[in-house]
């Protein structure tokens, strides 16, 4: 991969990793509701889960989904259902941790990693990266370089969202503001399904 192509890949990785989507909206809400320290496993799960998804797509999973459209459809339905469930949980959350009794908890590492497999934006990012930046002459090396680019860019990008959420904790310590923030985050998370439904 040429230096120009690798730099373009880094820009693609940055833009797709830092723009709003299911992961970043959930991290914003998690930062608000649980703080940055308790959100770290969620952030790491996103980064590692996406890395595994990216490698799987680069090593042939994307071709399998193209060959079996029913599997792709089933994955979209499962992902959509799980995304709606998460949106509901966020929308119904009413208490900041440390501010009273709550059963709410941040997403665990393994849950965040597994979510990447049903996250529509993650699939689009992975398939597009491999289709555009993978080199047919050096397939394995180009897949590894794409994975490295996303690994370098993804964790700092998603951390921005969790950090911003944590910065909002003081403002959202008012229960009414927190209620409406969580409802808005739940609705926005559900709205990320719209491109998948087209």
Where are these regions (language model features)?
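Selective transmembrane alpha-helices of multi-pass membrane proteins
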Residues: 66-95, 154-157, 161, 171-198
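Short loop-to-helix capping motifs
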Residues: 21, 35, 119-120, 174-175
């Amino acid at each position: 991969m040429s230096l120009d192509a690798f730099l373009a890949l880094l820009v693609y990785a940055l833009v797709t990793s830092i723009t709003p989507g299911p992961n970043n909206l959930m991290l914003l809400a998690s930062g608000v509701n649980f703080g940055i320290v308790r959100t770290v496993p969620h952030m790491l799960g996103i980064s590692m889960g996406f890395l595994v998804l990216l490698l799987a797509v680069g090593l042939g999973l994307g071709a399998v989904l193209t060959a079996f459209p029913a599997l792709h459809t089933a994955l979209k339905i499962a992902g959509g259902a799980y995304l709606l469930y998460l949106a509901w949980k966020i929308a119904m959350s009413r208490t900041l941790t440390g501010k009273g009794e709550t059963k709410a908890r941040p997403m665990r590492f393994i849950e965040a990693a597994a979510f990447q497999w049903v996250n529509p934006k993650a699939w689009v990012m992975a398939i597009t990266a491999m289709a555009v930046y993978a080199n047919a002459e050096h397939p394995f090396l180009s897949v590894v370089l794409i994975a490295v680019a996303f690994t370098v860019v993804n964790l700092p990008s998603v951390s921005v969202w969790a950090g911003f959420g944590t910065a909002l904790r003081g403002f959202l310590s008012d229960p009414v503001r927190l209620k409406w923030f969580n409802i808005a985050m739940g609705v926005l998370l559900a709205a990320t399904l719209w491109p998948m439904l087209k």
